């Protein structure tokens, strides 16, 4: 027989280390003898660091006794290279004790005479296979910081199931997930997720794991957490939610993942800002465009100071973002809690280049549409951008030509406006003049160098519009100006209904009708009051 006692559950004793708590583990000894009691004595080689209760005793046949091994952690101890395993050794002596009687374990500490275990008197079995393995929060935090994958798995598997070892926290209140995320280790995160951690646990700084990953831009980790149903919304403990942190830090891929999982694009931070506010403030243009494309409100006010994203862009002097926000329908005349519009904020910071987009461009547009030449001249002298465009790409020249304001057209041309500027559908001022039937305006444009052959995005020339609408005078002006007539006979049908005009070419293609919002119609009720934006 090799031994009198078996070690349960194994020869490895796990000792849980926790700050301010007794550090101990248990070992069960089983007497494998059927008829004889067995005496035992367990001794640590390092008696300063360990104590055992009971250290010796009698075990009846086929019964067990549980020992407590207490670890006395010295201050400022340097962890061994073998950590979480320990090189400390123990000696277990056991000997058959005929006629001995087992007593209450609480009274068996050193109750067995030491001479029972001398080989001169009896056959003594000596076992040195007992090993120590440390578990606990400090152990796991240390291993995660070091990135020791195998050791982390082993400690998690060996830990007592009565405490949730995977939810261990360090002295800063960070969970193991937070530590793994801070190191940018998706492999560690995936390992921890196998053991079912609380993925909504907040650190002492009040951030959830998903918020932490969103802030650092760890897209793969974010994907892993979202796969485990991590909440995309800000909790009451957090200052900012995942979408705010991703947008404010410019993490576009993370932002895409959050939006795909249904994150509320207009949710507010604790101080009342949306993700769009933060993206604009940090000049994260790609993130701002993505948010706008996913339904972010361009004119939402902060519950703090009442600023809209446009106020912020104006204060920064960000021309590009001002243009993007205006194109997405931002209302430029909203006032914040201090009674200021975006224009007022731009003026306060000396961003003169934004004046046209935020105010002067509107006035120039209105003056051009109404034919107010003096007002046009004054606005241009005060800094209005002559080539400024509205959200559809129209310049003041487009508007003046559409309305037939020839004196304004002359003034704009004399001041150097681009006569061939195109809107978002490829229409030039000449297209607008022809479609509206203004012969004198079209003739002036041709004389001033307008390109007669330019086509819209649908491939339509000004001459095709004139012929399709049977404008003989305009057709003559364009032909005399050098317009090229299309080869072949062009049959057309004119459809006029609800303020829409569509020209259909039955031989060489179709000139599709344009939408009410963007079409150039001849109805006096057509709204051309949309603001200009500066490019």
Curated annotation (Swiss-Prot):
Keyword Cell membrane: yes
ANK repeats: 135-164, 172-201, 205-234, 238-267, 271-300, 305-334, 338-359, 360-388, 392-421, 425-454, 458-487
Principal localisation: cytoplasm
Cellular component GO terms, alphabetical: cytosol; nucleus; plasma membrane
Organs and tissues of expression: Mostly expressed in roots and, to a lower extent, in shoot tips, stems, leaves and flowers.
Effect of inactivating the gene: Impaired arbuscular mycorrhiza (AM) fungi (e.g. Glomus intraradices, G.mosseae and Gigaspora margarita) passage across root epidermis and abolished arbuscule formation in root cortex during AM symbiosis, thus leading to aborted hyphopodia and no arbuscules.
Cited SMART domains: ANK
Keywords: ANK repeat, Cell membrane, Cytoplasm, Membrane, Nucleus, Repeat
Induction context: Regulated by RAM1 during arbuscular mycorrhiza (AM) formation after inoculation with Rhizophagus irregularis. Repressed by inorganic phosphate (Pi), leading to defects in cortical AM colonization of roots in high Pi conditions.
InterPro entries, per database record: Ankyrin_rpt, Ankyrin_rpt-contain_sf, Ig-like_fold, MSP_dom, PapD-like_sf
Function comment: Required for arbuscular mycorrhizal (AM) symbiosis with AM fungi (e.g. Glomus intraradices, G.mosseae and Gigaspora margarita) both during fungal passage across root epidermis and for arbuscule formation in cortical cells; this symbiosis promotes phosphorus (P) and copper (Cu) uptake. Essential for infection by symbiotic nitrogen-fixing rhizobial bacteria leading to the formation of root nodules.
Name of the protein in question: Protein VAPYRIN
The organism of origin for this protein: Petunia hybrida (Petunia)
Gene: VPY
